[in-house]
């Protein structure tokens, strides 16, 4: 009976966090709008080999993540939930692997359930796991690969070992097809310390080639298909998207070595109080084979991405699966022996909630700021934000009432965030980062437009997805579409600022021409170097400028 209650509680938890509130949040540009539009175009065109964005070749990532996203929109429709369905599914599958692996290591159902709940409620996991990017997919394949390797190395028969390594190769191959060759480097780096300390080199060298073969066979069909269709894909993807992005001095998203320290601290909420103890307990217990495996799995990718020139918080998502297992194991021991860390965790959550309440007041219309984040007419959004932090502090306090038994309720600290964050986003943020909001405000003007031009790829993708059209033209800036725009068949998909007046004269009689521009809040629209317009509709950071036939 208790097991049934736990399962009902887990399903209710998943529904409240990962299902019910998802449709209430508009898509963010540039990431969510980009991936939403790529998958929409894949469904519309039926081309499941070559990824396109705005009808242009888009070679920044391989294909597998777009497949999953496309299936999500096919099943649930072109809506906010449909766009995010793929990443939610991947996150829940990763949580299922956390459950299975914890059971495999400790044979403790309660520990497995706690590890799963901790993983799903970690701030970084929830933030990325409900956000339509490719990182939850690669995190799933990496976690699946690490589980497969452990399964292979623990098998007692050659059939079991062979099956484990074949499965490892498949997961690595799918990882390559999701985000590239990092799916090969990360698992290798993660297992090497464990293999060295356990002296398991023999099994690795005897059976490792099976993983190589299955990985190659997994990638080969699509790899050959896209090489035939687009011969320069692999050259661009390898040199630009891997070498330049991560290793060279001009790498994207450059950040210092210590960049991931605050990411881990913030990402570990609402379980931050368990982080030091979990790592220290794991180190103390390093003679235990499974603990070494989890530690290596956590630390090695973190070091690898810290050394790399380019960094983003999403890169280390897979590190939090083993960390959740270590936290759950440590928390159960602490509850029995010394609950100090659990009390500290409760106080951290109280402090975080109270700080958020104060910060919300400071940036509210009633606070001391001359330019508040929310305007007076957005009072309900301020109260939503207060509710988010109040619930966080409340559940932090509740865990202290009988800490040995109530500490798992820290998983409910982000409940307000999950349910209310979509209702608390300030209009000034929505107007710049949520193209859906802009489209809703300007739908009647946008719909009949013969041509739509914009100076932002993220906004262009949002317009294309909302209006169900892929012919948006880039104006003045090419951004990440620069490579695709270099192809001869992309001629006419970019108009520079100097060419716009002549282009307008040539195309004006064909129908309504609409410019959607990103502007600064204090920027004077009249100072823009464009011909006089028939209609100007400013929505804070985005402005619609329209030219009608004459």
Swiss-Prot record:
It is an enzyme of class 2 (transferase). The chain crosses the membrane at residues 7-27, 81-101, 111-133, 137-154, 165-185, 204-224, 263-283, 288-308, 315-335, 346-366, 382-402, 406-426. Keywords: Cell inner membrane, Cell membrane, Glycosyltransferase, Lipid A biosynthesis, Lipid biosynthesis, Lipid metabolism, Lipopolysaccharide biosynthesis, Membrane, Transferase, Transmembrane, Transmembrane helix. GO terms for molecular function: 4-amino-4-deoxy-L-arabinose transferase activity; mannosyltransferase activity. This is Undecaprenyl phosphate-alpha-4-amino-4-deoxy-L-arabinose arabinosyl transferase. PANTHER family: MANNOSYLTRANSFERASE YKCB-RELATED, UNDECAPRENYL PHOSPHATE-ALPHA-4-AMINO-4-DEOXY-L-ARABINOSE ARABINOSYL TRANSFERASE. GO terms for cellular component: plasma membrane. It catalyses: 4-amino-4-deoxy-alpha-L-arabinopyranosyl di-trans,octa-cis-undecaprenyl phosphate + lipid IVA = lipid IIA + di-trans,octa-cis-undecaprenyl phosphate. It comes from Escherichia coli O1:K1 / APEC. Pathway: Lipopolysaccharide metabolism; 4-amino-4-deoxy-beta-L-arabinose-lipid A biosynthesis. Its EC number is 2.4.2.43. InterPro entries: ArnT_tfrase, Glyco_trans_39/83, LipidA_mod_glycosyltrf_83. The gene is arnT. It is a multi-pass membrane protein. GO terms for biological process: lipid A biosynthetic process; lipopolysaccharide biosynthetic process; protein O-linked glycosylation; response to iron(III) ion. Its main location: membrane. Belongs to the glycosyltransferase 83 family. Signal peptide: none annotated. The keyword Lipid metabolism applies.
């Amino acid at each position: 009976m208790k097991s049934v209650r736990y399962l009902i509680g887990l399903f209710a938890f998943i529904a409240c966090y990962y299902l019910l509130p998802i449709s209430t949040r508009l898509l963010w540009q540039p990431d969510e709008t980009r991936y939403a539009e790529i998958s929409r175009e894949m469904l519309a065109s039926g081309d499941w080999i070559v990824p396109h964005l705005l009808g242009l070749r888009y070679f920044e990532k391989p294909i597998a993540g777009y497949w999953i996203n496309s299936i999500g929109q096919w099943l649930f429709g072109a809506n906010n939930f449909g766009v995010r369905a793929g990443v939610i599914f991947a996150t829940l599958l990763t949580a299922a692997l956390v459950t299975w692996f914890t059971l495999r290591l400790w044979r403790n159902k309660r520990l497995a359930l706690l590890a799963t709940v901790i993983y799903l409620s970690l701030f970084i996991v929830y933030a990325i796991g409900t956000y339509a990017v490719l990182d939850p997919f690669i995190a799933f394949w990496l976690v699946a690969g690490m589980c497969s390797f452990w399964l292979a190395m623990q098998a007692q028969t050659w059939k079991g070992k062979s099956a484990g390594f074949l499965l490892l190769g498949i997961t690595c191959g799918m990882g390559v097809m999701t985000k590239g060759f990092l799916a090969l480097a990360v698992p290798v780096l993660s297992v090497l310390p464990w293999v060295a300390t356990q002296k398991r080199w023999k099994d690795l060298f005897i059976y490792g080639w099976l993983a190589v073969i299955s990985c190659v066979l997994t990638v080969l069909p699509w790899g050959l298909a896209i090489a035939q269709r687009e011969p320069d894909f692999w050259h661009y993807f390898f040199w630009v998207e891997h070498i330049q992005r991560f290793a060279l001095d001009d790498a994207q998203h450059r950040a210092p070595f210590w960049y991931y320290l605050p990411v881990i601290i913030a990402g570990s909420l609402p379980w931050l109080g368990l982080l030091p103890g979990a790592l220290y307990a794991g180190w103390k217990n390093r003679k235990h084979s499974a603990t070494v495996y989890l530690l290596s799995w956590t630390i090695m990718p973190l070091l690898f991405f810290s050394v790399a020139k380019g960094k983003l918080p999403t890169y280390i998502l897979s590190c939090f699966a083993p960390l959740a297992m270590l936290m759950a194991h440590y928390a159960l021991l602490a509850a029995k022996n010394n609950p100090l860390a659990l009390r500290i965790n409760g106080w951290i959550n109280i402090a975080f909630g109270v700080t958020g309440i104060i910060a919300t007041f400071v940036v509210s219309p009633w606070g001391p700021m001359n330019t508040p984040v929310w305007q007076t007419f957005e009072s309900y959004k301020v109260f939503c934000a207060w509710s988010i932090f109040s619930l966080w502090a409340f559940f932090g306090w509740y865990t202290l009432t009988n800490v040995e038994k109530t500490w798992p309720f820290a998983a409910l600290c982000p409940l307000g965030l999950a349910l209310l964050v979509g209702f608390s986003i300030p209009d000034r943020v929505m107007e710049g980062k949520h193209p859906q909001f802009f489209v809703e405000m300007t739908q009647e003007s946008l719909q009949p437009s013969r041509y739509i031009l914009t100076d932002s790829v993220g906004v262009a993708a949002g317009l294309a997805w909302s209006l169900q059209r892929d012919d948006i033209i880039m104006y003045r800036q090419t951004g990440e579409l620069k490579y695709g725009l270099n192809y001869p068949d992309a001629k006419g998909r970019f108009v520079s600022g100097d060419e716009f007046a002549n282009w307008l004269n040539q195309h004006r009689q064909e129908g309504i021409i609409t410019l959607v521009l990103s502007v600064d809040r204090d920027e004077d629209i009249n100072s823009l170097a464009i011909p006089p317009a028939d209609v100007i509709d400013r929505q804070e950071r985005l402005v619609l400028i329209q030219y009608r036939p004459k």
